[in-house]
């Protein structure tokens, strides 16, 4: 598979997801990813014969569900920077005997499709990984036919308790970790898309949260977080401060413990709008 030119941050993102290629679809997390993909396709109301662009397609969950909807007369193009995830997607597509999906290794922030190329553009869960979301939304707007739809799956700024607590602790050390800030509320989502030129914006809010155990999550979640490029700024702290930050992180989580465990909010917004 051909390589693409990526900046350091995007190379690191691709490496993180390539390391997960064998596990991404598995277990509770894999089921959750699949549920989000199916719900997004449902909210967009993908139809027979449509041409669909799936941005950050990953292991092809959205692409495959959309392909079933568009049928043989439609076409899906899935784009991702992680070659390992695309390899998984290719195998899944072959196993499903679908011939209406084309996968491409490319950066979704610098695509050059012609204007008015797609009936639908979708991006599931990947917006926090992008470097210029407002510009990206304007670019994707140009790809849509008049009246075409964009569909986004994004998260509230209250979602994912480990990330929320990590952001809080990081701010004490002068570090701003941006996660779901741009899409953190329905009003923010609406403003973001309106500014990019979209209209008829509809937002469906759903909750995928659950209670989790502190014993099984604190140390592991800290270590896992530091392996993600978004959190690399924390690694620049002196070792003493980093250990202090970790202790504060665990203390903050401890304050959230109830008799049911810690509530891990997973408020999700399915945003659909037209060109």
Where are the language model's segments positioned?
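Conserved Class I S-adenosyl-L-methionine
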Residues: 3-8, 32, 59-61, 182-275
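Conserved class I S-adenosyl-L-methionine
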Residues: 2-50, 61-65, 85-88, 96, 151-176, ...
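A short acidic, Gly/Pro-enriched loop at the edge of an enzyme's catalytic core
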Residues: 109-121
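A short glycine-rich, Lys/Arg-flanked "PGG" loop and its adjoining helix->strand segment in the class I
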Residues: 134-149
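Class I SAM-dependent methyltransferase SAM/SAH-binding core
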Residues: 51-55, 59-111
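A short SAM/SAH-binding and catalytic strip from SAM-dependent methyltransferases
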Residues: 119-134, 156
């Amino acid at each position: 598979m051909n390589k693409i030119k990526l900046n350091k941050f995007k190379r690191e993102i691709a490496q993180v997801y390539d390391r997960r290629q064998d596990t991404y679809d598995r277990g509770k997390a894999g089921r959750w990813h699949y549920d989000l993909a199916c719900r997004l396709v449902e909210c967009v109301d993908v139809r027979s014969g449509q041409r669909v662009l799936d941005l950050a397609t990953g292991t092809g969950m959205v692409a495959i569900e959309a392909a079933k909807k568009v049928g043989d007369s439609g076409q899906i193009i899935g784009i991702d920077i992680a070659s390992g995830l695309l390899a998984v997607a290719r195998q899944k597509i072959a196993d499903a005997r679908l011939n209406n999906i084309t996968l491409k290794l490319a950066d979704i922030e610098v695509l050059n499709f012609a204007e008015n190329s797609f009936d639908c553009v979708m991006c599931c869960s990947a917006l926090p990984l992008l470097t210029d979301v407002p510009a990206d939304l304007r670019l994707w707007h140009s790809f849509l036919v008049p009246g075409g739809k964009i569909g986004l799956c994004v998260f509230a700024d209250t979602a994912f308790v480990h990330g929320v607590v990590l952001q809080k602790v990081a701010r004490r050390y002068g570090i701003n970790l941006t996660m779901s800030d741009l899409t953190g509320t329905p009003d923010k989502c609406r403003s973001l898309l309106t500014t990019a030129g979209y209209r008829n914006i509809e937002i469906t809010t759903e909750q995928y949260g659950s209670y989790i155990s502190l014993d099984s999550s604190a140390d592991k979640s800290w270590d896992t977080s530091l392996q993600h490029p978004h959190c690399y700024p924390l690694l620049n702290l002196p070792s003493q401060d980093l250990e202090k930050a970790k202790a504060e992180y665990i203390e903050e989580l401890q304050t959230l413990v109830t008799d049911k465990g810690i509530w891990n909010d997973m408020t999700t917004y399915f945003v659909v709008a037209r060109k």
